[in-house]
Amino acid sequence: MERTYAEYAAHQAVELLAIDSPTGFTRQAAEWVLNAFRSLGYEARTTVKGGVLIDLGGSDENDGLLLEAHADTLGGMVAEIKGTGRLRLTALGGMRPENGEAENVRVYTRSGRVIEGTFQLCNASVHVNGEYANAKRSYDTCEVVLD
């Protein structure tokens, strides 16, 4: 069965989006993009900063087009390991705590391990916390609970 362009694009997007690529860890995503374009027959190379440059060709050198996209995702960096074992984060990029609440996260350790957890309000029990709905979401009031 022949795939349509939309199916192909969706499949490629799912594959690329499945690659963890927080700021500073974009090499694997960049390599995926590089190989994807090479498999389509395009010349692709990496830049000094780790970006991917692809020449799509064309006959008029004075009528070019540049398309740029980020391969990194917004995220957080561990600012503190609390006495409870939970993690206080600080933002990387423009990540806002209210946008990440209740999201699953992966923490990359210095030794290369990946530990999963959940980013949530420090007092996340709606049964006990009467101020849950009104609580300000910030990196001081939210934390990562490790699995």
Give residue spans per PLM region.
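N-terminal hydrophobic/helix-forming segments and targeting peptides
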Residues: 1-147
